[in-house]
């Protein structure tokens, strides 16, 4: 991993478990997939990959809020944090 700020999300020595393309059914009964969910001892991170040129997180806020809500119901006693990871390695927490 060339981006040090991302290493803890992809190096298994740093997290408890990780899941790619994790499916869940939202409140409307739609099947959705979270790009990567990473479980640490004290928190869970929902990561979504973006390949566009813009680093503006605004267009993705509703999507990430939905992911956070869905995962907060699963990990009720754990902090759920969300971030976008752009193709250039930039991490934008939402």
What kind of feature is each model-predicted range?
Residues 1-94:
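Structural signature of nuclease core domains in nucleic-acid processing machines
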């Amino acid at each position: 991993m060339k981006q040090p700020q991302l290493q803890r999300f992809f190096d298994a020595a740093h997290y408890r478990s990780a899941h790619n393309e994790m499916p869940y059914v939202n409140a409307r009964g739609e099947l959705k997939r979270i790009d990567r969910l990473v479980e640490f001892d004290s928190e869970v991170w929902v990561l979504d990959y973006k390949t566009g040129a813009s680093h503006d997180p605004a267009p993705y806020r509703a999507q990430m809020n939905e992911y956070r809500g869905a995962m907060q119901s699963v990990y009720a006693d754990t902090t759920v944090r969300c971030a976008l990871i752009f193709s250039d390695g930039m991490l934008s927490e939402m």
